[in-house]
A protein has these predicted regions:
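Sec-dependent N-terminal signal peptides
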Residues: 4-13
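Sec/Tat signal peptide C-region and signal peptidase I cleavage site
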Residues: 15-19
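A Zn2+-metalloprotease active-site environment signal
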Residues: 20-259
Length: 259
């Protein structure tokens, strides 16, 4: 069994990335064998890419000529990568308010969020989301989700079930991850990353605090599902008031206006 498991691990790590259904079949077999499994950054990115592709297919992606895409392109000009992760940006045309960044570098922004925020505020939120990826906060969450999916295969490690792993399944996996909460420590780190991100973009980093103020006002609108996903992701501690206070203190200390 050890030799077989070692062979499977070697195959998983050394070959070109197979179709994602094959990856899940292999992971399922290893999980059933009780083996500890880790994924390389490249393997994880390939699996996440499949999930993001399914979400892109499920959602309405704004065309390259749309005002939303052009605005995002203008704001993110020159933002090609961070910490070795290459970005690709798209806008979803939707009434929901959200944005997310994934370990493969995919960054997706919802049009309603763009409607709600100024350029600087939007960059702050993007910086926060990119921070979770650049600081590797998202990596373990996605890896754990993939391994849970593999372990849940009840029909055998090489059954046709994984070969038929559907686009809707990939999409559901992705959606569960983009709304996942992070720890208090990770949220503070991502806030600080967003703050520094704004400074590097030549913007007033207090826009990070202003974005939090708007998110707080959204959270006070009872009965609305429009902001549900974004607010759920941002609702873990620290709370909005603390985040706003921290951003204000940092901005004032750095000599920026906080109006």
């Amino acid at each position: 069994m050890k030799k077989l498991s070692a062979l499977l691990i070697f195959f998983l790590c050394a070959t070109a990335m197979p179709a994602q259904s094959s990856l899940l079949r292999i992971l399922s077999g290893l999980a059933k064998a009780g083996q500890a499994i880790t994924l390389t950054d490249e393997q994880l990115a390939a699996a996440v890419k499949e999930s993001v592709a399914a979400m892109d297919k499920k959602n309405t992606v704004c065309s390259a000529s749309s005002a939303y895409t052009q605005r995002l392109k203008r704001l993110t000009k020159g933002m090609n990568a961070a910490d070795g992760i290459k970005f690709n940006f798209k806008v979803y045309k939707t009434s929901e308010v959200n944005a997310f960044a994934c370990p493969d570098g995919s960054v997706r922004v919802y049009s309603a969020l763009m409607d709600a925020l100024s350029d600087d505020e939007l960059l702050g939120v993007l910086g926060h989301e990119i921070g979770h990826v650049a600081l590797r906060h998202s990596k373990k969450s996605w890896q754990d989700a993939l391994l849970r999916s593999a372990a849940s295969d009840a029909l055998g490690s090489f059954s046709d079930t994984w070969a038929e792993f559907s686009a809707s399944s990939w999409s559901s996996l992705g959606e569960s991850m983009i709304s996942a909460k992070h720890s208090r420590h990770h949220e503070r780190q991502a806030d600080d990353y967003g703050y520094e991100f704004l400074k590097k973009c030549g913007r007033n980093p207090w826009a990070m605090g202003k974005a939090f103020k708007k998110l707080k006002s959204f959270s006070e609108k009872s009965g609305s599902t429009k902001y549900a996903k974004l607010l759920y992701a941002f609702s873990s501690h620290p709370d909005f008031d603390e985040r706003i206070r921290r951003m204000r203190e940092r901005a004032e200390e750095d000599g920026y206006s906080c109006h």
